[in-house]
From Swiss-Prot:
This is Insulinoma-associated protein 1a. Residues 99-141, 229-269 are annotated as: Disordered. Disulfide bonds: none annotated. The lineage of its organism: Eukaryota, Metazoa, Chordata, Craniata, Vertebrata. SUPFAM superfamilies: beta-beta-alpha zinc fingers (SSF57667).
Amino acid sequence: MPRGFLVKRNKKATPVSYRVRSEEDEQGAFVAQDVPCARRPVSPVQFGNPETVYRAMYSPTRPVSREHERACLERRFNLGSPISAESFPAAPNCSDQAPVDLKIGTSNSNRTGTTVTTKRPASDTERKGKPASKKAKAMRKLQFEDEMTTSPVLGLKIKEGPVEQKPRSQCASGDKPLGEFVCQLCREAYADPFSLAQHKCSRIVRIEYRCPECDKLFSCPANLASHRRWHKPKQSAESNKTPAPEKEETSSDRDTPSPGLSESGSEDGLYDCQHCGKKFKRQAYLKKHVTAHHDAPEKPQSHAPLNLSASECHLCPVCGENFPSRMSQERHIRLQHSAQVYPCKYCPAMFYSSPGLTRHINKCHPSENRQVILLQMPVRPAC
């Protein structure tokens, strides 16, 4: 067996001539001594085939035939080690490729290590984050339950419970312990649910809102605020100094005047009593005060309504003159203010504006009943 046969199979992928083998053996030995990475086991290609020695007699730089080229390419592709892939490996090339293999190995190992280490802390943080969120939800629920201590609609409030509570272990009779029906506020136990529902808890306090003007009690502040609007005078009544008494009467029916106001009055009132000088916020309060404390009720000077048939006063709506009876008032209007009066042709009503007379005729005397009323009405003598 020739000297360079083993070196050719172990170190070189392609066969070379015998003239170069002596130099390459020295270089291969130098590389094997200096570089430890070249000691990797290389999978030999075509092991034990002596025909490769005879084909290597040709020059490695220039193959003689295409079959030799094809064999060289197949050997290069079938090699497993990157070091043996070249036909003429040198010492610097081998030293460059060895650390590359080491770097690849270390980089792969580092990558796998980093991936494992990065996944583990992420899972730890996720596991730690879940109980924290549950604690936050529990704290929210506790705070919400603590805030539910008042009921503004029902007017109830729950007092703070005592620090030390002594639960009852047995009932009064001592037969069996009471723990099934217990009040959650005062911790008092009862034998049946009916007695638990009927008991009055000591921690529940009823809140009452009192009106400062009429002393009425309300359980809700919103109801008190809506009630106090009735005590305030309307701005429209202040702007219009001649309010209609019919509207005032309807509004006074809805109002509930307080006894304190009717007796003592208020300083901010708009209506003055002519007898005692007291002021009242509403005309209904003044009327009640006059009827209760003074014999001859008198109303403050105000314009009378246009329709005299529905009114109770006897003032002339044009000049304001007072008359003892209604007949004298109508006679005065016919004689003195005949040009400003619009009498109704179908009834004795009189109006002081054309739109008022028209509205009265359309409402009280429709077109179907006008002729019947005309036949029944007596002829009015001219004055």
